[in-house]
Regions:
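Residue-level "edge-of-site" marker
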Residues: 73
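Conserved beta-strand-loop surface patch within small alpha/beta domains used
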Residues: 1-67, 76-129
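Conserved, mostly hydrophobic/aromatic
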Residues: 70
Length: 129
């Protein structure tokens, strides 16, 4: 995620979090990069197409995993959800990782979830070895 954000800077990167769910905790096994398909405002927005989701989901299932969330970068902005992120992001239970990329270098990385549709809460996500 960090390298992907640095590579696409000053545009936002995006991708899928693949893993499993143990109780209320998402366990991250793999990261699956996606192409930001947004045509304009790529510095502050990203777009994952349904076709990209289908491919990532099929890949995850072939490995006994599922799509447990998404990630994207915030070029020259904090690793915290924006109002736009709140309105256009994940479903309850999914993880939403944001990596800050400052002047082309990866900085903070935080994971969030939305227990309901009204706000984000920072979460810990387990990373499988």
């Amino acid at each position: 995620m960090r390298k992907h954000g640095e590579k696409t800077y000053p545009h936002e990167c995006c991708g899928f979090l693949l893993g499993t769910r143990e109780g209320e905790t998402n366990v991250l096994s793999e990261v699956h990069a996606a192409e930001n398909e947004r045509q304009e405002s790529r510095e502050t927005r990203y777009l994952i197409t349904p076709e990209q989701y289908k491919r990532a989901d099929a890949y995850a299932r072939s490995r006994g995993l599922g799509v447990i969330g998404y990630y994207h970068s915030h070029p020259d902005h904090p690793a915290a959800p924006s109002g736009y992120d709140l309105d256009h992001s994940c479903w309850p239970g999914e993880s939403y990782i944001i990596v800050a990329v400052e002047q082309g270098k990866s900085a903070a990385l935080n994971s969030f979830t939305k227990p309901d549709y009204t706000q984000f809460e920072q979460e810990e996500i387990l990373v499988e070895d």
